[in-house]
């Protein structure tokens, strides 16, 4: 019942916030992976 009362803009905002969170988490994981790769190259 809540979905019928919500306007389309609110759903778009939720989708954009979710994509932003996924992008931030993926960049953090990518930076940690890069640091790990550099650490392996040193040894």
Swiss-Prot record:
One of its GO terms (cellular component) is cell periphery. Its main location: membrane. This is Plasma membrane ATPase proteolipid 2. The keyword Transmembrane helix applies. It is found in: Cell membrane. Residues 30-43 are cytoplasmic. The gene is PMP2. Residues 1-5 form a propeptide. The chain crosses the membrane at residues 9-29.
């Amino acid at each position: 019942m809540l979905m019928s009362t919500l306007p389309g803009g609110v759903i778009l905002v939720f989708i954009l916030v979710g994509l932003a969170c996924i992008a931030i988490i993926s960049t953090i994981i990518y930076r940690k992976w890069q640091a790990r790769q550099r650490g392996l190259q040193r040894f």
